[in-house]
């Protein structure tokens, strides 16, 4: 089959590899190069890097709504377009171009967590399971019927980064299964999404990473896990702004104001929350690297005297 692949971040790379394994990827669409790093130089997306390594033509339009972009898509004579975390809305005219339309690999069990950040929102909400859906795209945000799906459990201490990697691999497998069926002349049965259970995974931003100690420790611990490795939770700890890379909730009764230091040891730094306490295990000072609580306490001997 002739496939157009549209994707941008690391999450999409495994799916591109799966599509290229037994099919002809005639073009890759990805977001324009963006400034990144300390030098703010233009940096290609992970999908672009993979496409170039495979010798696949790369297109980086600012929009797919122009007549020129539509003409280019039509000229590729694609059987199918596969979309994985592309970052651009596909208008109806684009959805109708490939013979079999457009498929999307989405990192949630739809209709739960439609939108931009399903992996992190699932952890933040305390979900115990998630998965991947292969969806036939329709106009609208992740509303199309589901062709195939796979579910997995979320680990009790699993971070956003760890779950991201597992779902990227699972998404590639589900896509490969779907492409295999289509190649054999079997079109997967499209199941409409239920009207009940719809939730939206709104885009992450750095402001959401600021923790409020007045919230329950369980909620804060989930946010620390969800926002690792980006945008990384941050909070004021003993008068200092730090980033939190690892923490667990303690069901600990106390009478201290939120944000108070309850205990400090090599096992972690316990901070009073609105309900329970948060044990900080891995943290990062401004301008520094992530370190264990034990290493942090070596630099903050004053905290040992306060415990």
Curated annotation (Swiss-Prot):
Entry keyword annotation includes Protein biosynthesis: yes
InterPro entries found in the cross-reference section: Fmt, Formyl_trans_C, Formyl_trans_C_sf, Formyl_transf_N, Formyl_transf_N_sf, Formyl_transferase-like_C_sf, GART_AS, Met-tRNA-FMT_C
Keyword set includes Protein biosynthesis: yes
EC number: 2.1.2.9
Catalytic activity: L-methionyl-tRNA(fMet) + (6R)-10-formyltetrahydrofolate = N-formyl-L-methionyl-tRNA(fMet) + (6S)-5,6,7,8-tetrahydrofolate + H(+)
Gene Ontology MF terms in the entry: methionyl-tRNA formyltransferase activity
PANTHER family named among the record's database cross-references: METHIONYL-TRNA FORMYLTRANSFERASE, METHIONYL-TRNA FORMYLTRANSFERASE, MITOCHONDRIAL
Function of the molecule: Attaches a formyl group to the free amino group of methionyl-tRNA(fMet). The formyl group appears to play a dual role in the initiator identity of N-formylmethionyl-tRNA by promoting its recognition by IF2 and preventing the misappropriation of this tRNA by the elongation apparatus.
HAMAP family: Formyl_trans (MF_00182)
Similarity comment: family membership: Belongs to the Fmt family.
Protein known as: Methionyl-tRNA formyltransferase
Classification of source organism: Bacteria, Pseudomonadati, Pseudomonadota, Gammaproteobacteria, Lysobacterales
